[in-house]
Amino acid sequence: MTDRVYNVLFLCTGNTARSILAESILRKDGMGRFNAFSAGSHPKGEVNPFALKVLAAQGYPTEGARSKNWDEFATPEAPKMDFVFTVCDSAAGEACPVWPGHPVTAHWGIEDPAAVEGTDIEKERAFNLAFRYLRNRITQFTALPIESLDRLTLKNRLREIGEEEGATHNAQLVN
């Protein structure tokens, strides 16, 4: 067993909801084996309040959560990523920066809870569902014997995880 800590970046377009949820989930559930980050291709500059509410209700950290541009992670000074996951279909379709470190990538697209219209209860329900889908994927990811898998096997397993319950149609096609 290794003491290596893996750097993981979650991407979506606005960096207000799904990627923020995933970052917080991995920070807590990664048990020190992972450094979690999130960013967006076109960040909105603020975190969706429903994302913060759901994370807090589930006992996940929200301090330091901020909407930021993915360019922060494409510089030579940025942490070298081991894994980069897109969690929205539009970010998966964009030309991503060249990430230092040549990370393993996968698309884990789920529906955008911030796009749900309706009552606050309906919006919160959508965020809880997104949280559940992401936590399920992250639980499987953190259980992988990363050190003992070759790159191709690891990439295939990450693709399979991305196709789990809640995957967008595009996530099933991209992977």
For the regions a language model picked out, list residue spans one by one.
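Short polar/charged helix/loop
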Residues: 1-175
